[in-house]
């Protein structure tokens, strides 16, 4: 019987904690952001698979298109991944002729190749269409508001 009481007490306190947890708007927003991301990621991965890319490689191409000449560490920092993870992806992408490293001073700088740029140009319209479809439940104004709020949140992080 003591075990049963312990279980009931445990359930009760978990229930109370969950109630308090879900009353917190920041926690609810966090959970919802995670859920949306988890629903979009598989569709994005499937779309990219058709181009023989994965989401990490797409992020690398997209970032280098905007900021060519980054070091491997700068690129890893921009994409919030480890230098080792970045090295893995860059080796595969170099083998495919999508990126190349050029020595500049004591560091190697990363650049898109013509093939990398072509593949990104092919992927971008499909990526945009998929994201537009997944955000179709929001008006254009709501999308802009959400982007602004998330940008504000992103820039407030240490």
Predicted features and spans:
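Helix-turn-helix DNA-binding motif, specifically the short coil turn and the N-cap/start of the second
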Residues: 82-85
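Residues within the alpha-helical elements of helix-turn-helix
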Residues: 63, 78
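N-terminal leader segment of winged-helix/HTH proteins
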Residues: 1-51, 152
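Short alpha-helical "packing" element that flanks the helix-turn-helix/winged-helix DNA-binding module
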Residues: 57-61
């Amino acid at each position: 019987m003591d075990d049963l009481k312990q279980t009931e007490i445990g359930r009760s306190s978990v229930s109370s904690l969950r109630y308090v947890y879900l009353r917190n708007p920041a926690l609810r927003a966090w959970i919802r952001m995670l859920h949306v991301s988890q629903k979009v990621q598989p569709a994005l991965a499937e779309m990219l698979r058709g181009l023989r890319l994965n989401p990490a490689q797409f992020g690398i191409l997209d970032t280098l298109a905007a900021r060519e000449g980054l070091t491997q560490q700068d690129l890893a920092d921009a994409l919030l991944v480890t230098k080792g993870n970045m090295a893995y992806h860059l080796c595969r992408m170099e083998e495919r002729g999508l990126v190349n490293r050029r020595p500049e001073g004591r560091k190697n700088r990363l650049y898109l190749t013509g093939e990398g740029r072509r593949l990104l140009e092919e992927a971008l319209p499909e990526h945009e269409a998929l994201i537009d479809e997944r955000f179709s439940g929001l008006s254009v104004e709501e999308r802009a508001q959400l982007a602004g709020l998330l940008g504000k949140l992103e820039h407030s992080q240490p």
